[in-house]
Amino acid sequence: MKDSVILVLINKKTGEKKVIKGENIITTAGDTYYAQKACGESPTNNFSQLYLCTAGPTTPAKDDDYSDFTVSGGTNNPKSPESGYPKTNDNDSDNTGAGVGITSWKYAYAITDGPFTSITHWFISKAGASGTDPILNSYKCPSAWDKDASSEAKVFVNHQNLGS
């Protein structure tokens, strides 16, 4: 699978918009999840929640799991996806990685969510994940970022099955 992530931070006081883009890796458990969904089966893991983290692997890998990360504190972490997600052909104009054959997950953080400081990694897992629970994907930000009480944020996680 080819995959990308996009973070959009919007300062509600100044109107400034900051966009951070990068690549993430689908884990082995994530490959299984997508295969089961494609076959109409109930997935072994009910991946849905986005976990923001202050530390994680130097290089994301196929075998990463919950224990490889330091999950951040803050209100609404982990976060459920926006209603209607995941979906294909996302029409949110901030999701520049969307497309017909791309599965997009969207997570929106309001001013009241957080605060989150020094976020360097994130992943999608099940609600209440802990220990060595499996994760769908593993992502390392190109640089740390903060979300304070004057900011909203949108996180898009995009996955494209390349068929190879």
Locate predicted features.
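Small cysteine-rich, disulfide-bonded extracellular modules of the LU/uPAR three-finger superfamily
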Residues: 1-120, 126-164
